[in-house]
Amino acid sequence: MMLKPSIDTLLDKVPSKYSLVILQAKRAHELEAGATPTQAFKSVKSTLQALEEIESGNVVIHPDPAAKRAAVRARIEAERLAREEEERKIKEQIAKEKEEEGEKI
């Protein structure tokens, strides 16, 4: 029985079979958690879907893990700052409305 995608095809995409297993497991967990798929799948199982994405080249190992972690931290920080700015604007709007309401009375 021939499995698709084949291990030979997949090993052309990643440096070692150990890296392949880790990448597949991480991507399968992401898909299970609701991550957006990068393509239409033939397979139903998330583990096989992850292999399909790896085979097509849509999912790769980041060449510099430290840079990836830094990018993730920067994105999280930017999201936090955006939320804080939005909260500040809402509080300012509420204060302005209360002030206008006080002038009307």
UniProtKB/Swiss-Prot annotation:
UniProt keyword terms in alphabetical order: DNA-directed RNA polymerase, Nucleotidyltransferase, Transcription, Transferase
A GO MF label: DNA binding
InterPro entries assigned to the protein according to its UniProt record, in alphabetical order: DNA-dir_RNA_pol_omega (IPR003716), Pol_omega/Rpo6/RPB6 (IPR006110), RPB6/omega-like_sf (IPR036161)
Record's catalysed reaction(s): RNA(n) + a ribonucleoside 5'-triphosphate = RNA(n+1) + diphosphate
Keyword Transferase among UniProt keywords: yes
Family designation: Belongs to the RNA polymerase subunit omega family.
HAMAP family assigned: RNApol_bact_RpoZ
PANTHER family in the cross-refs: DNA-DIRECTED RNA POLYMERASE SUBUNIT OMEGA (PTHR34476:SF1)
Protein name: DNA-directed RNA polymerase subunit omega
Species: Streptococcus equi subsp. zooepidemicus (strain MGCS10565)
